[in-house]
Design a protein with these regions (language model features):
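A short alpha-helical cap/connector motif
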Residues: 1-114, 118-143, 147-214
Length: 214
């Protein structure tokens, strides 16, 4: 938690700039990811904003290379040869494809994908559909604040089942109606997900999801 707090990330128990409660995700990250701490890993973070979390991750995972995608990179304030920052809207599939190609990313490349982006329902589902395949075997896909569409109508921007119901169906290997995830997508998830866990942080909307690939 000290690293998230030091760099000013809202993942910390206390948000440094306001002294108010943060999401309190540190303990979940530590418990789930400590085994990767000294390994050479690639991390994709969606929604990096100022780069506070990315800087903390780089300090914690000293052998990591981190790729940061954000719609507005003008606020990003950290630099490192292992921090790679790209300005793009994650829902723009054409630009996403182009960016991944430019940086030489192939499927099964990222050890961690962390979605802390818009929290819009459509973006979370699209990112999961598209980027889960870029996880390495045993990789972990993380969605922060995944229940925002449950709490805030503006994040529920499409007519679709919510993430908590979606992951319930994935756990049960039960097909569901979706205009984003077709049968082939769902089959892929059924075959490639080994564990799904959710945790509650400090605040009403502090919900975090870990999906492990087999």
């Amino acid at each position: 938690d000290k690293l998230f707090h030091y760099y000013g990330s809202d993942k910390a128990d206390i948000f440094r700039s306001t002294k108010e409660k943060g999401h309190g995700f540190s303990k979940f990250y530590s418990n789930k990811l400590n085994h990767l701490r000294d390994k050479y890993i690639n991390i994709l973070e969606i929604g990096s904003y100022s780069g506070a979390s990315a800087a903390a991750f780089k300090k914690y995972f000293k052998n990591s290379k981190i790729y940061c995608f954000d719609i507005n990179i003008s606020n990003f304030k950290y630099s490192s040869k292992d921090l790679n920052v790209f300005g793009l809207d994650i829902s723009d599939k054409k630009k996403l494809n182009k960016t991944l190609k430019e940086i030489g990313v192939k499927q099964e490349y990222f050890d961690l994908v962390i979605d802390d982006g818009s929290h819009n329902l459509s973006d979370m589902i699209f990112s999961l559909k598209y980027l889960f395949k870029y996880l390495t075997k045993k990789g972990i896909y993380i969605i922060e604040d995944f229940k925002h569409p449950n709490y805030y109508q503006y994040n529920r921007n499409i007519d679709h089942i919510l993430i908590d119901e979606l992951i319930g169906n994935l756990k049960d290997k039960k097909f569901f109606e979706s205009n984003i995830l077709d049968k082939n997508d769902q089959d892929y998830f059924f075959d490639n997900i080994t564990k799904i866990e959710t945790f509650k942080g400090n605040l009403k909307d502090s919900d975090i999801l870990f999906i492990e690939k087999n």
